[in-house]
Amino acid sequence: MNGPALDTLLATHGPVLPVVLPLLAGALLLLLESARSQALQRWVPWVSATATFALLALAALLLRQASGGEVQAYLVGNWPAPFGISLALDRLGALMVLLTAAVACTALVYALGGMAARGLHFHALFQFQLMGLNGAFLTADLFNLFVFFEVLLAASYGLLLHGRGAGQRQRLQAAVHYVTFNLAGSSLFLIALGLLYGVTGTLNMADLAHKLPVLPPGDVRLAQVAALLLLTVFAVKAALLPLYFWLPDTYAAASAPVGALFAIMTKVGVYAVLRVTTLVFGAEVAAPFLSLLALATLALAAVGALAATRLRGLVAYLVVASAGTLLLAAGLGSEGTLAAGLFYLINSTLVAAAWFLLADRIAAARGGSDLLQPRPLGGGWALPGAAFCVAAVAVAGVPPLAGFMGKALLLQAAGPLPMGPWVVAGVLASSLAVMVALARAGSVIFWKSAQVGAAAPDASPAHATALAGVLAAVLALAAAAGPISAYTGAAAGQLLQRQGYIDAVLGARPAPAAWDVRKEMRERGDAK
């Protein structure tokens, strides 16, 4: 496809392509994985890899398109908002889609090292989860946010259980807790949507932004209840205290590539909080409690990391700590804290994905155990040892990597605010606790395990490529901190200036078509 044709395609159908591509790939992979022909089944990894890397290229093009500042709305089925399904691409949505694609490529390459073959329909579930994630980041109405949540959750249930042998019982127990929590969250989500639709007659986020400020006094309380229910649901997804207890066991039980992909899952909840508080309800709906709960989440995650007895459990608490930091930035609500939070979001997602892969490689080098106890080291631990140092520096917020830059930007922006001293103390204390936890883990794994055991299998090319690739992305983020922080600053400004998003969604007009079903329905009505 030549340049002008590609530009036309992106300008016309850009927001829907990240949803359609994994949907079609997942459907095709489901057929191929179910085929009896071995020749057809051999195509499965090639189709999955092609679709995932094509998504990465598409996401990069969409980011370039969104960087200009224009919000692009897409009317599914050509029905105008707020009556039809609307998708919208802005700077934040484009960033999240690109980050999802980058993590997906890393996880898939690692899975191609052998883990994808340990269960049924891995590749199809993987693509359907990408569809749900991208749809959640691009939808412009709350009901379809619910739909995409259910799609990604249904796929994640299967991915969590994926795998055979060691850890299967642990995965099953974690899956029961995970499903129970998320089913309860889905029920609350539906109740909140019913309340909102009952008082406003719409679930389109741009339309809600218009209608909520002019509600009759009798309906305001119902809308506030709906807002709190929605924030509760998103707090479950984002692992905010006291609703984060499902996450450590779930993420620790997942296989390495699934855990790496799950690194973006908590960010869906953070994204939803950002979107509804800046666009629909206003920051004041969460201001009384979000920052305080985020600080408490950060504190307990640091304690959990210090108390962890397994490396995968430690990594899971690092994910909770990053979610607390991001929600702290969202709760403070200024443009500076939001910009810093978005920059930190990129680093924390990439580093979390790296840690899940790294924990698996370290366990392999130690005979399959991730217990933080001295054990004989097998061969093949040079790559995990070097990667451990880079990942530890990145996640703890130590110079010169991007974790330090993100936290420094957050502290700089939060300093003048009323909660500034608490934010500074909480972030610095949690960073110190994470450094201590990682130093303890590193000393146990690499220094106290001086005895050399039987040689462990070397990392496969796929495993080494995936781990090196994601760590290279972490290093590149630090090297390109200037332009990336400029982009996240622009994305934060666009979030707070919501009128552009509202105008783009409600002002989108259906494209002319040769056959218009609405016109035909009107003509039939006139004829009668």
Regions found by a protein language model. Name each.
Residues 241, 345-368, 421-457:
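Predominantly late transmembrane helices and immediately cytosolic-facing juxtamembrane segments
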Residues 138, 189-201, 265-279, 325-341, ...:
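Hydrophobic alpha-helical transmembrane segments in multi-pass integral membrane proteins
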Residues 371-372, 377-386, 438-528:
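Cytoplasmic/organellar membrane-interface segments at the starts of transmembrane helices
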Residues 1-17, 24-126, 206-210, 494, ...:
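Transmembrane helix-loop-helix hairpins at membrane boundaries of multipass inner-membrane proteins
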